[in-house]
């Protein structure tokens, strides 16, 4: 199967996972291992990756030699805050350029503020960041972000942490069809079938956190999500049969049937 390519780098796994909301770093480690993910996203404002030398660091549980870190701007509500946060991340991670940009509109819905997101993306791309960007499922905004130079566009399936699944597959399909950079569903996945549907639509990957960390058994759910993403990708590549309302053809041979007459 073809690898996922982001900013010129190849990844075998098409599942990206967050690192927040777990009981501790050990549970984080076990869940990430079970997911098979190679890219892990981390909220710079909430997680210790070296800011506090006296506290446990995520870097010890998930060594950068094994995983690609994707610093994100969770908790940022303005372009300026997001830019400042990612500049700090680059310092903490020794010049790391691959980042996830998210600028939120409000604290209740966590819906993206697209105008502020575009403003931040323009600055970050000019500064040499490789920007993977969280956005709405608006195809026009998605295309604008690609044109700015973002290396991946990450439309929501539904609101962050809602677990509502894919609410607007039609808009996602338009984005997938129009963009040339990877399209990664980010936010709203609740269970394995949601991840499979996203991949069957043709998404290049799926990113999730709460769907795994919020499960009764996060490690088992991580394993389920790994399989779901793989199954969805294979189904997309295989090509599904056409949908039919009632003109179905029998799946069993029709020749050589035993006559019903005596």
Curated annotation (Swiss-Prot):
GO terms for cellular component: cytoplasm. Keywords: Cytoplasm, Schiff base, Thiamine biosynthesis, Transferase. The active site is at 100 (schiff-base intermediate with dxp). Coiled coil: none annotated. GO terms for molecular function: thiazole synthase activity. One of its GO terms (biological process) is thiamine diphosphate biosynthetic process. Pathway: Cofactor biosynthesis; thiamine diphosphate biosynthesis. It is found in: Cytoplasm. Its EC number is 2.8.1.10. It comes from the Bacteria. InterPro entries: Aldolase_TIM (IPR013785), Thiazole_synthase_ThiG (IPR033983), ThiG (IPR008867). It is an enzyme of class 2 (transferase). 1-deoxy-D-xylulose 5-phosphate binds at residues 161, 187-188, 209-210. PANTHER family: THIAZOLE SYNTHASE (PTHR34266:SF2). Belongs to the ThiG family. Catalyzes the rearrangement of 1-deoxy-D-xylulose 5-phosphate (DXP) to produce the thiazole phosphate moiety of thiamine. Sulfur is provided by the thiocarboxylate moiety of the carrier protein ThiS. In vitro, sulfur can be provided by H(2)S. This is Thiazole synthase. It comes from Thiobacillus denitrificans (strain ATCC 25259 / T1).
